[in-house]
Swiss-Prot record:
Taxonomy of the source species: Eukaryota, Sar, Stramenopiles, Ochrophyta, PX clade
Main subcellular localisation: mitochondrion
SUPFAM superfamilies: F1F0 ATP synthase subunit A
Gene label: ATP6
Organism this protein belongs to: Pylaiella littoralis
Name of this protein: ATP synthase subunit a
Record text on subunit structure and interactions: F-type ATPases have 2 components, CF(1) - the catalytic core - and CF(0) - the membrane proton channel. CF(1) has five subunits: alpha(3), beta(3), gamma(1), delta(1), epsilon(1). CF(0) has three main subunits: a, b and c.
Keywords from the UniProt entry: ATP synthesis, CF(0), Hydrogen ion transport, Ion transport, Membrane, Mitochondrion, Mitochondrion inner membrane, Transmembrane, Transmembrane helix, Transport
Family as reported in the entry's similarity comment: Belongs to the ATPase A chain family.
Length: 248
């Protein structure tokens, strides 16, 4: 008997303790989040502590590639405030990428497969967007009403623009959550099929090579999806921030 492929997304308490209505339990999701952040901080601590080498190591090449690719993304998508928002967007991109890849490690936990986690990331971006928009004062209303719009169309366009703007963080969060959850579920299903065929014996023992090969291919695709989803989340965040800056 095999467990449900969705059990891998269950949040389990590793250390339970609390007081009255408050629960301070340490869960697998919390532990994975701390590991992702610690790994990110450790890499860059080592890089800046030991300095940059004229003949870079593999880790230095990876980190420099991560930095320059994110910088190019922000520089191309964000307006005049790009030096101020780059550190934030770089941390967002790195954290999502590390979390996505870490979720592919056996017996690990994919925190980006939970809507609450991706929603927190999306709301963090949109809190910054709202702060930038409010800095424009009354000019921020042009974000919901394009110039030259007639009064008749304004009554139709303004509610539509407001609703679409409110749902942007939700779409940003759901896109990341759904892709990661679907990919990991598919991997678990294919792995369960291959394992069942191996345990059946006979011709199925030989035929299990087929789903096993599919599993290897899907694992490679899931690595690509982990990078693509981090990129998509970051590029959309750049676009939303740029729209808030130029009110477009």
């Amino acid at each position: 008997m095999f467990n449900s492929p969705l059990e891998q997304f269950e949040i389990l308490p590793l250390l339970s303790f609390g007081a009255n209505l408050f629960d301070f339990s340490i869960t697998n999701a919390m532990l994975t989040t701390c590991v992702s952040l610690s790994f990110f901080l450790f890499l860059f601590y080592c890089l800046f502590s030991y300095g940059l080498n004229s003949f870079p190591t593999r880790w230095q090449l990876v980190l420099e590639g991560l930095y320059t690719s994110t910088a190019g993304l922000v520089w191309d998508s964000v307006g005049p405030r790009r030096p101020k928002v780059f550190p934030f967007l770089f941390v967002i991109f790195s954290f999502i990428l590390i979390s996505n890849v870490q979720g592919l490690v056996p017996y690990s936990f994919t925190i980006t497969s939970h809507l609450i986690q991706t929603m927190v990331l999306a709301l963090t971006v949109f809190i910054g967007v709202i702060i930038i928009v409010l800095a424009h004062g009354f000019h921020m209303l042009s974000l919901f009403l394009p110039g030259g719009t007639s009064i008749v169309l304004a009554f139709l366009l303004v509610p539509i623009e407001i609703v679409s703007y409110v749902f942007k963080p939700l779409s940003l969060a759901v896109r990341l959550f759904a892709n990661m959850m679907a990919g990991h579920t598919l991997l678990k299903v294919i792995a369960a099929v291959a394992w069942a065929m191996m345990g059946s014996g006979g011709l199925l023992l030989i035929a299990h090579i087929v789903p096993l090969g599919v599993l290897v291919i899907l694992f490679g695709l899931e690595l690509a999806v982990a990078l693509i989803q981090a990129y998509v989340f970051t590029i959309l965040s750049c676009i939303y921030i740029n729209d808030a800056i130029v009110l477009h």
